[in-house]
């Protein structure tokens, strides 16, 4: 049984912690999550497994960009490898995105690298904007002239609909209305959003 207080303490103290790894968020996006835990929650790795037709597999839940190993200290390639090899053998297929601080050996033929772009928001907007390339600045100007803007008051149902109508229509296992409703209800309840 996962001690969620200890888990969340680990994520809070991790140099690479993210919202995706907090227990409350994992409970929303994949209520059956499990974990690899080193010692007394020094390092942790959420496991997002399911079973279909008697075959266990790990997958990347919707609305979770990345997971991986979370630690208070920088992880070596060997330490990351130890966690990967500790994933239970019952998982016959694994599709799981490690966070950017989980460096792995390029020699592993079962690992595929994907591009991941993150924008560091520690700096003020003007500093960030000044460091954009010309193409990004041009695209921002087009968006502004088209009347596109940031909306902070969006309902969770709208986020779910945007996902379903765009990315979700290409994802075969995103057609279960009960899962969509549960995710929406959980986001409304846990994130303090409200319904119209």
Regions found by a protein language model. Name each.
Residues 49-111:
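Acyl-donor binding region in acyl/amide transferases
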Residues 1-54, 98-196:
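A conserved beta-strand-loop-helix scaffold within acyl/acetyltransferase catalytic domains
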